Amino acid sequence: MGAIRGPVRKIDLNCDMGESFGVYRIGADEEIMPLITSANIACGFHGGDPQVMRRTVRLAREHGVAVGAHPGYRDLVGFWRRPVRCSPDEVYADVLYQIGALAAFCRAEGVALRHVKPHGALYNTAAADAAIAGAVARAVADFDRSLMLYAPPGSALEQAGLAAGLRVIREGFADRGYAADGTLLPRTHPGAVLHEPERAAAQARGMVCSGTVTADTGEEVAVPAETLCVHGDHPSVIQVLRRIRSELEAAGVSVGAPGAD
């Protein structure tokens, strides 16, 4: 998953946002937004509706948070965390559609769309499947080649993004457990989600300061991350984000969106 590297002095903190839908409220967006630097906003397929999308874009603008599109498979009931059989052509069209939908709200609100990060099962599939990864990367590039693509380091999605001429931002997960091969543990696996703020913050600091995480086997695995994700539906997300920021500040690391100096 990449060579071990030295400490970085700046890191992006991203979170999946705007995933409420109709009367169903998911996440604590108003409390989370001041603590992050990039927001991955749901585009209506796994979560989010037009009102939620507009409201979340406005909330990001209010707090100076960079906005990204968070597209995925068409699976509202499964919250897009279930694998869905789709052809690369279907994935291309669905991703392009969703980017366009969020971009419309960004344009109306005077907010720049900065990046794209696939959600859930699409993210995991694109990380390993070159054809699906290529479809995602082409959709992003065909919409706007200046958009950044968030991807796991060393993944098929990273390679597809680079091949499409995109700037790829390597992503690590502060609140998820890792396997020895550098991939995320399945959510059904013990230790897949780090519930304790102290553990998540320690993992975040390790990725930023040494470029490594401790896998479930106890091995140190290289995860060279430029952005760290904390899931918005994590039950302790506020405490996790505050602890991460405190740990990074103590280590002399600043937080900021990619390209924002």
Curated annotation (Swiss-Prot):
EC number(s) stated in the UniProt entry for this protein: 3.5.2.9
InterPro entries per UniProt: Glyco_hydro/deAcase_b/a-brl, LamB/YcsF/PxpA-like
Enzyme's top EC category: hydrolase
Claim: Transcription regulation is one of the keywords in the record: no
Origin: domain of life: Bacteria
Keywords: ATP-binding, Hydrolase, Nucleotide-binding
Biological processes, Gene Ontology terms: carbohydrate metabolic process
GO molecular function per UniProt: 5-oxoprolinase (ATP-hydrolyzing) activity; ATP binding
Annotated catalysed reactions: 5-oxo-L-proline + ATP + 2 H2O = L-glutamate + ADP + phosphate + H(+)
Subunit note: Forms a complex composed of PxpA, PxpB and PxpC.
Its biological purpose: Catalyzes the cleavage of 5-oxoproline to form L-glutamate coupled to the hydrolysis of ATP to ADP and inorganic phosphate.
UniProt record similarity statement: Belongs to the LamB/PxpA family.
UniProt-recorded name of the protein: 5-oxoprolinase subunit A
Organism of origin: Symbiobacterium thermophilum (strain DSM 24528 / JCM 14929 / IAM 14863 / T)
